[in-house]
């Protein structure tokens, strides 16, 4: 682990390896990690050194290199571009490849997947990890391969299936479009983060509402979808009654949920959903329920 910190990631990684080496430049922090690992009965090689110095002087070869780059700059501002992280992954990627054939990097959920793919060499796999539909981490696994990177979209603490694909899959797909039908599908945020908008349409046989509305529809219910499924019907906005309760969702729509709530004098909550969306034919209000 080249970015030890408090050693939490390294502790769990170490359960899968016979030996682990931790690099940390902060002496006091490394002393804390040493103490914690002794208490937990876990052994490691502790090296109090700057990452750059370690890479320059190291003669060993490792089965796996792990990094979790710092996501704040010298002014404590959040950063997420690869070139702004510390260490700068783009600058050191060749040095990393010299000491291991497999490299695992944990990155911010804000990282742009296309930027990632265009900036790093030898991307083997990417995991986009969400917890309860909030993207928490992006993991990138570097290993020399002739294949296109595989992308895995995972929504933990949900019953939704994993969705995975390679980049060529998305490039060769096209979406077909439709007005809203009986069932509405909203992919979870790990899938949306991946950018596989056309592949979702083609793989599940769904129609998209609009190029910029990443919501899908079908007349028959499709099972095992990586996201939420709603059974809906379209209503005229004049049919929305004052004081009714809705969970409001807007996608590519002129009004935000708070503006809809204020305009139509409706309340949050209840079991019903009001979905305000834009299709190629115009704006729609859909009322329905979330299916299990």
Across the structure, where does each feature detected by a protein language model lie?
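SAM-dependent transferase fold signal centered on methyltransferase-like domains
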Residues: 1-292
